[in-house]
Regions:
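Terminal substrate-recognition subdomain of acyl/acetyltransferases
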Residues: 1-112, 119-126, 134-139, 148, ...
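Acyl-donor binding region in acyl/amide transferases
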Residues: 127, 133-184
Length: 184
């Protein structure tokens, strides 16, 4: 694996150096600690299948340049498993469901940030992974995935129905998209 990375790195040195100029910044040290493979991301399919290596580097550079420029004070918290608490979701008595914004390494190809509904055990009940980028000079939020409960969650279909009831008819999937739009 290391040999492949070194060969690819040598072959695409200029592009990887472009990426490192952004993610190598001291303010992004928490990112590198949480996701040491960040530099490898453009070497594989990322965000959409047709993106070239140069486009993948640009997507990552734009995302992290935006975060560094606008939200540098939040970076350390974004790259922790706890992330930033955005709110809570209606839950049954004695239960807590958190809405969290964070960098989740599970979404290696789908996006650099995610909004997730998490139960008390920290299991993802629903997630939306995305990147912040620019298109024709206009900032855009690109959603890479919307995912339901992770495999460890018991009875996922029943859970989604319960979450929809608790949310007064608002489906978790719709909530994730609405929250992403609010962040944009």
């Amino acid at each position: 694996k290391m040999v492949k990375f070194m060969l690819r790195g040598a072959l695409h040195r200029v592009e990887l150096e472009r990426l490192w100029r952004v993610v190598g910044a001291p303010t992004l040290a928490p990112l590198r600690a949480a996701d040491p493979g960040i530099v490898e991301k453009p070497l594989r399919p990322y965000l959409h299948a047709r993106a070239s290596l140069s486009e993948r580097v640009t997507l990552l550079r734009q995302h992290y340049a935006f975060l560094r420029g606008r939200h540098a004070g939040l970076l350390a918290r974004l790259f922790t498993p706890q992330g930033i608490l955005l709110g809570s979701y209606p839950a049954s008595e004695g239960e807590s469901i958190r809405i969290v914004l964070r960098h989740d390494v599970t979404f290696r190809r789908e996006g650099e940030l995610s909004i997730s509904l998490l139960n008390e055990a920290g299991q993802r009940l629903y997630s939306c992974a995305f990147n912040i980028t620019e298109r024709a000079g206009v900032r855009a939020l690109v959603i890479g995935s919307l995912q339901g409960p992770e495999p460890a969650v018991v009875e996922p279909m029943a859970l989604i129905q319960q979450l929809t009831k608790r949310g007064f008819g608002l489906r978790p999937k719709s909530l994730m998209v609405m929250l992403a739009f609010m962040l944009a």
